[in-house]
């Protein structure tokens, strides 16, 4: 199910393995014109400390050049909100969780119709990716 407990993002939990989920997310992003520019591993960020209940945890930073052109044209400061972050992690319940930052929620603060319009297109693509992931999870 689409997880609704997060106020600034959306996503799903899958039963497939972490590695399989990560590779599937990367493929689906690429299929929708998103390039992955950053890949952060939580282990590196927290210098090997264990965070209670969390297993593998990777943050992917992705951008779609078409949407990025629209966003930067609408507001050059938008770079602070880039890239689009997608997290893939093991929450400790035997599943794999995929969450996407909700670009529209964040753009609402900007109050620029062009930026909001571009953000809605990004969100549509991300929602499709989450749906595609759920369909794979038999």
PLM regions with names:
Residues 2-32, 131:
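Terminal, regulation- and interaction-focused segments at domain boundaries
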Residues 4-8, 56, 82, 94:
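A generic structural signal for well-ordered coil/turn residues at beta-strand boundaries
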Residues 26, 43, 127:
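Short glycine-/small-residue-rich flexible loop motifs, especially phosphate/cofactor-binding loops
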Residues 37, 41-84:
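Compact, glycine-rich, soluble single-domain proteins
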Residues 85-111:
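Beta-strand/loop substructures that line and gate deep hydrophobic ligand-binding cavities in soluble
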Residues 109-138:
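Well-ordered alpha/beta subsegment
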